[in-house]
Amino acid sequence: MASTAKILVTNDDGIHSPGLRLLYEAVKELGRVYVLAPETPKSASGLGITLHKPLRIGKVKIWGDTMVYITNGTPSDVIYIAIEEFSPRFDVVVSGVNIGDNTSIQVILSSGTIGAAAQAALLGIPGIAFSADIDEASQLEEDRETWENMKRVIRAITSWVLEHGMPEGVDLISVNFPRKVRKDTKVKIAPAARIKFLQKVSVLYDPRGRKYYWLYGTLVEPEPGSDVYVVHVEKAIAITPLSLNVNVKEGEWAAVVENIKPMIQAAESALRAQTSATVSTA
């Protein structure tokens, strides 16, 4: 499978991110690799797609003589454009390596890196998102041992998915690396924590006295065993299997239906009351 596999490489940090190069180097020998990434950073774009302007792609040579493609769209746009331009079917989409980890449901839902993998998964294509607990791109480039070890892990995980597919019940996989990856770094499966940050808002004023807002967050104490804990406290690699099924858990459905009946009745009563009022007025 590997030699004939079609692999799409993308990210949300933009075409010039060293994380994209690392990802390409890790998977380039596993099949036919296509690189299409946003021309500028699109962090925190989630599953967002572009509907208000034309999307375009272009070619550029980087990393020596490697031809890659750029777009003015989002990471999720990349999936649809790549299917249209390169292949109607990819065997896997790999996204990253993101500068900054994408741990916790709070972050997962806004991540453009995971958004690309999730968009692929929605179309039935295995998606894997890779992220690293670093603050600056230079940290990735300067630590060559971490760089090479991350490549080994990425290649192994991608190769496994190409050979075996996603495990049953799993739509995509999020992989988060600690700041340093050594040969004795542990690899653990970890569920996503609910939140990572306590979200805050700063209220400020520009030189003309107009109010503006700046969003930021402070880290909360991570729950042991969660992806945040594994990466930040244990300094291990966290593998988090994810499902796109956002429905209430099947076993809890009957109880939820029973508990929500009063709300449904209230909604129906509101409709009937409106109808009665309309009839009376007429």
UniProtKB/Swiss-Prot annotation:
Keyword list (alphabetical) reads: Cytoplasm, Hydrolase, Metal-binding, Nucleotide-binding
State the free-text cofactor note. Answer: Binds 1 divalent metal cation per subunit.
Per UniProt, the enzyme's principal EC class comes to hydrolase
* InterPro entries xrefs: SurE, SurE-like_Pase/nucleotidase, SurE-like_sf
> Which cofactors does it use?
a divalent metal cation
According to its UniProt record, the EC number is 3.1.3.5
Primary site of residence:
cytoplasm
Which reaction(s) does its UniProt entry say it catalyses? a ribonucleoside 5'-phosphate + H2O = a ribonucleoside + phosphate
Q: Does the keyword Nucleus apply?
A: no
Q: Which Pfam families match?
A: SurE
* Amino-acid positions noted as binding a divalent metal cation in the UniProt annotation, renumbered to this chain: D12, D13, S43, N98
- SUPFAM superfamilies cross-referenced by the UniProt entry: SurE-like
Which Gene Ontology MF annotations are present? 5'-nucleotidase activity; metal ion binding; nucleotide binding
Q: Supply the Gene3D superfamilies for this chain.
A: Survival protein SurE-like phosphatase/nucleotidase (3.40.1210.10)
Q: Keyword Protease on this protein?
A: no
Annotated localization: Cytoplasm
Cellular component GO terms, alphabetical: cytoplasm
Q: What does this protein do?
A: Nucleotidase that shows phosphatase activity on nucleoside 5'-monophosphates.
Per the similarity annotation, which family is this? Belongs to the SurE nucleotidase family.
Q: What is this protein called?
A: 5'-nucleotidase SurE
**Biological source species:** Hyperthermus butylicus (strain DSM 5456 / JCM 9403 / PLM1-5)
The uppermost taxa in this organism's lineage are: Archaea, Thermoproteota, Thermoprotei, Desulfurococcales, Pyrodictiaceae
Q: Which gene encodes it?
A: surE
